[in-house]
């Protein structure tokens, strides 16, 4: 939804509509996914985990349930994080959606009178990373500059390169950048109102994406679905079974309010 605020004269009586509201729609393609795994407790007899197995040769429990569940939840979260940005077989990620919307998205690495595109052969380095982030920031549409949830997303590799450049080329690093934010991968870009957030899903892609959080949408059934799973011993099959089922998809509302940097 978008609406304007055209101010009209209030000196006369009567009704004279000056406002206009428009509605549009973008669809979220939600992928229906599941993860299933079968484990044989007998295979643990050759490892230290045998000490956690039930005495004897008949196993009817899940001795490693907590450790396995914690590790599996971590791996599911990592896989979903990558899918949100890069997509998978079941839904398109942000990068793929940006590729499809290139005609209306602000392309930060496009050639202009003031910018020479950075090629893949050159890459993002300590020599050019500050100018790249400056370009992304300067390309953010004026319509959203005053929003309090502006974010520039990048991969951890580019975040590390940026921090290295700030340390070596300017003294601003120690004066304006929050040290805890460095550890968390979440800082305010010096001299701006924009956060820079490092996300694993963009690591090694050399894509940098800027918009406001209210422009990004994550579609699912239940937010906790990927954390709710079953782990049980199947006596019929003489094995431990794991299953997780969830739905997920992403979309953005206004492509023209997205800044997309990709190497030329």
PLM regions with names:
Residues 81-97:
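Short, glycine/acidic-rich hinge or "gate" loops at secondary-structure transitions
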Residues 143, 148-158, 163:
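Beta-edge loop/turn motif
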């Amino acid at each position: 939804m978008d609406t304007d605020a055209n101010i009209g004269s209030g000196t006369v009586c009567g009704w004279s509509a000056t406002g206009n509201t428009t509605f549009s729609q973008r669809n979220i393609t939600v992928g229906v996914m599941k993860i299933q795994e079968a484990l044989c407790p007998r295979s643990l007899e050759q490892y230290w985990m045998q000490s956690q197995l039930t005495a004897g040769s008949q196993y009817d429990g899940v001795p490693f349930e907590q450790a396995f569940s914690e590790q599996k939840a971590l791996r599911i979260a990592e896989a979903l994080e990558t899918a949100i940005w890069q997509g998978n077989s079941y839904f398109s990620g942000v990068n793929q959606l940006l590729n499809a919307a290139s005609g209306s998205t602000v392309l930060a690495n496009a050639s202009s009178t003031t910018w020479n595109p950075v090629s893949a052969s050159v890459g993002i380095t300590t020599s050019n990373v500050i100018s790249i982030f400056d370009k992304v920031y300067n390309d953010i549409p004026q319509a959203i500059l005053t929003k309090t949830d502006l974010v520039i997303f990048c991969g951890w590799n580019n975040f590390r390169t940026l921090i290295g450049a700030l340390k070596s080329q300017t003294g601003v690093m120690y004066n304006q950048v929050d040290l805890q934010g460095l550890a968390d991968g979440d800082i305010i870009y010096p001299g701006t109102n924009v956060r820079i957030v490092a996300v694993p899903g963009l690591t090694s892609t050399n894509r940098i994406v800027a918009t406001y959080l209210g422009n990004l949408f994550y579609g699912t059934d239940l937010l906790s679905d990927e954390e709710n799973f079953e782990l049980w011993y199947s006596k019929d099959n003489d094995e431990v079974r794991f299953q997780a089922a969830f739905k997920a998809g992403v979309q953005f509302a206004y492509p023209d309010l997205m800044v997309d940097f990709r190497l030329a």
